[in-house]
């Protein structure tokens, strides 16, 4: 069944770790392949009904297995990076001090350049830095799960 998701083994392990993390956070009830497939079918059915009613909706009319897996993995990541209410309630998303954000800005100054060689000010990119730091924290949580399963 996992072959229909078109992933190499390493990527599949990372996807399973993200599903487990989402389950641990209460974003999904079941991290199994069968449950993933069931959620995909439900989403496709929901989109079909919206399309029949002429309602506007965001995204494709039909999700293939690889598309839906990527949709869920992206959604879980965004729920952490831009903390959803559920993630906020759990208190698992880190907050960062101004000093930590400023340190990231100074160590990654090249990320904040513009076309003509000038740079965005720290204040202009502070929210972006917060998101990047939360992405790193999310990746570490996934990595911890992968290390535990080795």
What residue ranges belong to the model's regions?
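PPIase-associated folding chaperone regions across multiple families
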Residues: 53-150
């Amino acid at each position: 069944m996992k072959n229909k998701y078109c992933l190499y083994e390493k990527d599949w392990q990372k996807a399973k770790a993200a599903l487990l993390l989402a389950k641990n956070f209460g974003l999904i009830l079941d991290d199994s392949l069968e449950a993933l497939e069931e959620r995909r079918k439900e989403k496709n059915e929901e989109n079909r009904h919206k399309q029949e009613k002429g309602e506007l909706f965001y995204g494709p009319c039909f999700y293939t297995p690889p598309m839906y897996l990527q949709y869920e993995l992206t959604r879980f990541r965004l729920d952490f990076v831009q903390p959803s209410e559920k993630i906020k309630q759990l208190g698992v998303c880190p907050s960062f001090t101004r000093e930590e954000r400023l340190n990231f800005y100074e160590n990654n100054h090249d990320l904040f350049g513009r076309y003509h060689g000038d740079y965005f000010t720290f204040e202009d990119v502070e929210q972006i830095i917060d998101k990047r730091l939360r992405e790193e924290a999310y990746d570490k949580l996934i990595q911890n799960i992968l290390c535990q399963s080795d």
